[in-house]
Amino acid sequence: MKPELLETFENQYPNRDYTIEIVNPEFTSVCPKTGLPDFGTITLQYIPNKLCVELKSLKYYYLEFRNAGIFYENVTNKILDDLVKAVKPKEMKIISEWKARGGITTTVTASYEAEK
């Protein structure tokens, strides 16, 4: 995973709190136990401060996970950490919803809130 792929642009309305929601319904990674592919939906919700994430760079960042052996919980927290570092939002939440494996589905949510 390469967080340096993430690009940003200036938020034109930094004094207004508004929520940006970006959904990737085609996220893939690899189960580190079985080596089988994991399929999920990643939802990014954030209130920007001075910067917003650029979508094409986010897409390529997500593609870095395609061949990575990584647990769901680690995917979710890694994405949150990398995006918080790049965007420095007021608030951010990552929700990862994973397709059923052995009849069990998993949803992982990780959140960040800047100190006021």
Curated annotation (Swiss-Prot):
GO cellular component: cytoplasm
Keyword Lipoprotein on entry: no
Catalytic residues of the enzyme: C31, D38
Listed Pfam families: QueF
Entry EC number(s): 1.7.1.13
Domain of life according to the entry: Bacteria
Protein name: NADPH-dependent 7-cyano-7-deazaguanine reductase
Gene that this polypeptide is encoded by: queF
